[in-house]
Amino acid sequence: AGSMLARNYFFVKNSKNFVFAGQKEYLIGDGLLSKAWEFLSFIDDHTAWSQPRLRDREMHKMSGYKKKVNGLEIEMGMKSQILGVSLKDNPDKVRGKAGELVFFEEAGSFPGLLKAWEVTMPTMRQGSKTLGMMIAFGTGGTEGSDFEAMEEIFYNPEAYDCMGYENKWDEGAVGTTCGYFIPIQRNLDGFIDDEGNSKEQVAVEYEEEMREKKKGAADAKSLDQ
């Protein structure tokens, strides 16, 4: 996700790219925005297509520069942007924020996700044309995480203008569609070969062994970790 934001920032002129989250902590620190900023810094430092910045804030970066024209400072350059927005239980904050790329970070712990998604959808269309791409991702598992909205979108993708995939993950779901699911055994650290392929069967065995160990814990919540 961070690389997708960086791609648009450097190569799609005037693009607006948003990351929405229920809490600011999901955006910065070890969050998606911080990872995107690392991409920008690396590319600026190590490539020939670095970009000057008109805005350089914790939650907002905008490429470009200022030039004096007839005594006035004019903003020039790519003018592509990456913006983070913490909704804080106020999904209406997404209103009017259309972009080439819109992420809903930690969607499994996102109060008001369904309303935020439905408010954003009309801004991404112009007649029969779709102007950008919306992606909701992240897992649930935390007690009180409000996972129901993510579950609704995941199991009814077409109703929310999402790409549907054959459901090959749930038992008894043959012939139904859902969102795209990435199981824990895919890309699990320590179980990837030299060519980058996941050693899924070995990863499953490892995960089952770890879960078996946790069954003896006094706190049942340890199984959710």
Q: Could you tell me what each predicted segment is?
A:
Residues 1-225:
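Phosphate/NTP-binding elements of NTP-utilizing enzymes
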